[in-house]
């Protein structure tokens, strides 16, 4: 059965004059054709994921390709049964990818048009994965890695991308004098991060051209050596990559059983992404810790209209009490 919706994932590092006005004009056009999605615009380029029916997405691609400097912009296309977004957002930012460099000086940022790692095709990347002398580094957030990653890839001990440069500096013995290949969802983060590694003095740095999304669609590699699913920042949450021998590697936050269902911790001050079943979400009040379960503004408790007595009952079932809540 044909799927009616197309999801477009794309980015391009290209100088954009008057980027704030560009963002406003871009939003107006997207709304005029009924497109949904999330787009970041900066002086350094554009980065977005959008969805719509065939006609709408075709209009959008034609429009983008008509813009100066974007004639060759590469759209990665998924076909789906439902919209991947509920609304349309286009926002101006200082950068489309923020590396979190320690001096926070945007003039000292990496320009991928000048400095970036060597591009590897899916076939070349797969060959590198099988090379014991190559270090494979996942540049995504921890919760993205936990849902799915390339076999043998290093999981940096970080919560988000901004922490990655410092983590690499702190663990440089893992990478110095070795070939390093990096990957991310669609390629936008790796363009900048691989350039940063080159600037740091790493001699042999490669990146998966087009990211995981392209690797999964390649007719030759068919996503092989990828375990789990790929996390995406839209209503789908995850997509399949390995079409040869897929496996589930995600583990439930609470009991460690295989799981590929993500929720945000019920404590709005925590908001950690955790893998868990519906059963355990109910059992643990969607809280990743006792502190989060008993937090006065626990969203799970509010959404389900639980009384204090019901909360006490749920906590007692897992050997906990409301004492922390009372203390607050």
From Swiss-Prot:
The keyword Oxidoreductase applies. It holds the Pfam family UPF0176_N. GO terms for biological process: tRNA modification. The keyword Oxidoreductase applies. The active site is at 184 (cysteine persulfide intermediate). Residues 130-224 form the Rhodanese domain. It comes from the Bacteria. GO terms for molecular function: oxidoreductase activity, acting on paired donors, with incorporation or reduction of molecular oxygen. Keywords: Oxidoreductase, tRNA processing. It catalyses: uridine(34) in tRNA + AH2 + O2 = 5-hydroxyuridine(34) in tRNA + A + H2O. Its EC number is 1.14.-.-. Catalyzes oxygen-dependent 5-hydroxyuridine (ho5U) modification at position 34 in tRNAs. Belongs to the TrhO family. This is tRNA uridine(34) hydroxylase.
């Amino acid at each position: 059965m044909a799927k009616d919706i197309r999801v477009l994932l794309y980015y391009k590092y290209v100088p954009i004059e008057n980027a704030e006005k560009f963002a406003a004009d871009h939003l107006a056009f997207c709304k005029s054709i009924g497109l949904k999605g999330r787009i970041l615009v900066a002086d350094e380029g554009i980065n977005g994921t959008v969805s719509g029916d065939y006609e709408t997405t075709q209009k959008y691609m034609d429009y983008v390709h008509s813009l100066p400097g974007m004639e060759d912009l590469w759209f990665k296309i998924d076909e789906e049964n439902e919209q991947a977004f509920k609304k349309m957002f286009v926002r101006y930012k200082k950068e489309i990818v923020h590396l979190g460099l320690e001096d926070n000086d945007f003039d000292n940022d990496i320009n991928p048009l000048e400095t970036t790692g060597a591009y590897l095709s899916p076939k070349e990347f797969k060959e590198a994965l099988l090379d014991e002398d190559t270090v494979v580094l996942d540049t995504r957030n921890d919760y993205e890695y936990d849902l799915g990653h390339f076999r043998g890839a290093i999981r940096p001990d970080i919560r988000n991308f901004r922490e990655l440069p410092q983590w690499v500096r702190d663990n440089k013995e893992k990478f110095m004098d070795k070939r390093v290949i990096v990957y991310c969802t669609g390629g936008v983060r790796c363009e900048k991060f691989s350039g940063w590694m080159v600037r740091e003095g790493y001699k042999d740095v490669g990146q998966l051209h087009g990211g995981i999304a392209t690797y999964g669609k390649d007719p030759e590699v068919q996503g092989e050596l990828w375990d789990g699913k790929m996390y995406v920042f839209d209503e789908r949450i995850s997509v399949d990559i390995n079409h040869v021998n897929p496996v589930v590697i995600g583990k439930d936050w609470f009991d460690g059983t295989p799981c590929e269902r993500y929720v945000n911790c019920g404590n709005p001050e925590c908001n950690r992404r955790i893998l868990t079943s519906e059963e355990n979400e109910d059992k643990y009040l969607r809280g990743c810790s006792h502190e989060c379960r008993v937090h006065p503004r626990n969203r799970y408790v509010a959404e389900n209209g639980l009384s204090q007595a019901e909360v006490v009952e749920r906590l007692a079932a897992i050997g906990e009490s409301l004492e922390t809540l009372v203390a607050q």
